[in-house]
């Protein structure tokens, strides 16, 4: 039997899809090259934006069309959309949708449902917990779900309440990855700063980082995503002493206006966020700062939008992931009066993206002439690419092997990547 996995959304979904791929292969299934060759499609869905949900529905509808013509493939739908829009999935996919697995279920529960669905009678019981190991870097989720309940966000409904993995389980997985040759570990959580709170750990997040940082074979350590309200000075001070932590901080600000931040239920102010960035830069002189921003939140005035423009100019983010507000389910923000017209949202998005691209280009071009360290992720015909400690993409010239750690001198740059040449 042939399968194809289609993944939408975040790194957490990428991680889960990798686990599920390993499971399918372990029970004798073969990965199809394309959807048309598959007997079934496993969709791992994302509900953060309306566009992501619509993308899933379009794909499920396409599978249904093929199913009506050829009797295959069928769909299995998992992830966040499966939690909040099961009726819509069944309406679009009809009899081609054979199984829906909610995003609130953990990997063990998904394993049991898949076993039952495929009537697998015997296989190695531990196989579903194995991580695909042939990678320069690996994502390792440490906490699932979210308890922050921002007014615009559907993740708590789609993913459930926060649930931390035991630290021993995380360290065991990371050790296996490092022993297999992985060089960079990226710890994941919807709000990773909350790691361990449900386990009764007062400083669980920084203690986890400290434990991972000590592991043999680790070259780089990263984490995402942090909630600014849960980042404290003590954590930053302890981070400064970590040998392998990379100087890249993703801190979603969402808005530069205090009234909008309050409506979003973000639990911090513009002033607090600016102080936090200042404290990060004090301790990590070469840190890159990236962020998420929503424009066109309900009732946002032109002046309030301009507050966000001003914040972006003041902080000079290395990158901003900018989205126009999208109504999600029955979240409080979706039900608010004062919804902004689409044309206004698009214009604000266009303006802010233009500003950010100019800032990113300027910051990247300031790297010209400098030498930086890159771990090679891909190499072919005298060219390779990898990422800097600040998580910037570098495309460079030189004959190297995948997973080599090399020095590269930057000679050009734009808003998308740096260009360099091998120096050794």
What are these regions (language model features)?
Residues 200-211, 233-247, 300-318, 342-347, ...:
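Short, electropositive alpha-helical surface patch
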Residues 189-198, 230-232, 253-264, 295-302, ...:
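Flexible glycine/acidic-rich beta-alpha junction loops that bind and position SAM and/or redox cofactors
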Residues 179, 206-207, 214-221, 231-291:
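Radical SAM/AdoMet-radical enzyme domain recognition
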Residues 47-52, 182-211, 215, 227-234, ...:
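Conserved glycine-rich "GG(E/T)P / GGGxP" loop and the immediately following alpha-helix
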Residues 335-424:
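Terminal RNA-binding accessory module
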Residues 76-77, 222-224:
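Short catalytic-loop micro-motif centered on adjacent basic/acidic residues
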Residues 1-195, 234, 245, 249, ...:
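Proteins enriched for Cys/Gly/acidic motifs involved in redox and nucleic-acid/cofactor modification
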Residues 150, 170, 187, 223, ...:
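Conserved, mostly hydrophobic/aromatic
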């Amino acid at each position: 039997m042939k399968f194809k996995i289609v993944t939408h959304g975040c790194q957490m979904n990428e991680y889960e899809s990798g686990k599920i791929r390993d499971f399918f292969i372990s029970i004798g299934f073969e990965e199809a090259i394309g959807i048309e060759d598959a007997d079934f499609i496993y969709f791992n869905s994302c509900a953060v934006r309306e566009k992501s949900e619509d993308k899933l529905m379009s794909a499920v509808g396409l599978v249904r069309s093929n199913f009506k013509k050829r009797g295959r493939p069928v769909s299995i739908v998992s992830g966040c959309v499966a939690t909040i829009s099961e009726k819509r999935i069944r309406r679009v996919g009809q009899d081609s949708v054979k199984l829906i697995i909610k995003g609130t279920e953990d990997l063990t529960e998904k394993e049991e449902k898949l076993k039952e669905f495929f009537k697998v009678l015997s296989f190695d019981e531990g196989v579903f917990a194995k991580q695909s190991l042939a990678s320069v870097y690996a994502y390792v989720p440490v906490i699932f779900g979210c308890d922050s309940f921002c007014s615009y966000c559907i993740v708590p409904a789609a993913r459930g309440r926060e649930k931390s993995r035991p630290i021993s389980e995380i360290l065991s997985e990371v050790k296996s990855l490092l022993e297999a040759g992985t060089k960079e570990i990226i710890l994941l959580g919807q709000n990773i700063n909350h790691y361990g709170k449900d386990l009764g750990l007062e400083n669980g997040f920084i203690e986890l980082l400290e434990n991972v940082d000590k592991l043999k074979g680790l070259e780089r350590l990263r984490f995402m995503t942090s909630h600014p309200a849960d980042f404290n000075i003590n954590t930053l001070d302890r981070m400064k002493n970590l040998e392998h932590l990379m100087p890249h901080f993703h801190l979603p600000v969402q808005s530069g206006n205090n009234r909008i931040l309050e409506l979003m239920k973000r639990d911090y102010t513009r002033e607090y966020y600016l102080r936090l960035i200042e404290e990060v830069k004090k301790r990590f002189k070469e840190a890159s700062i990236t962020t998420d921003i929503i424009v066109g939140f309900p009732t946002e005035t032109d002046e309030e939008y301009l507050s966000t423009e001003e914040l972006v100019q003041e902080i000079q983010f290395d990158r901003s992931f900018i989205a126009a507000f999208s109504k999600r389910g029955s979240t409080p923000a979706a039900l608010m009066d004062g919804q902004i017209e689409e044309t206004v949202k698009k214009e604000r998005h266009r303006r802010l993206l233009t500003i950010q691209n100019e800032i990113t280009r300027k910051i990247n071009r300031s790297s010209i002439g400098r030498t930086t360290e890159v771990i090679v992720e891909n190499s072919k015909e005298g060219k390779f690419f990898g990422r800097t400690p600040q998580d910037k993409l570098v495309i460079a010239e030189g004959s190297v092997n995948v997973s080599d750690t090399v020095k590269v001198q930057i000679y050009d740059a734009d808003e998308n990547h740096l260009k360099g040449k091998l120096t050794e």
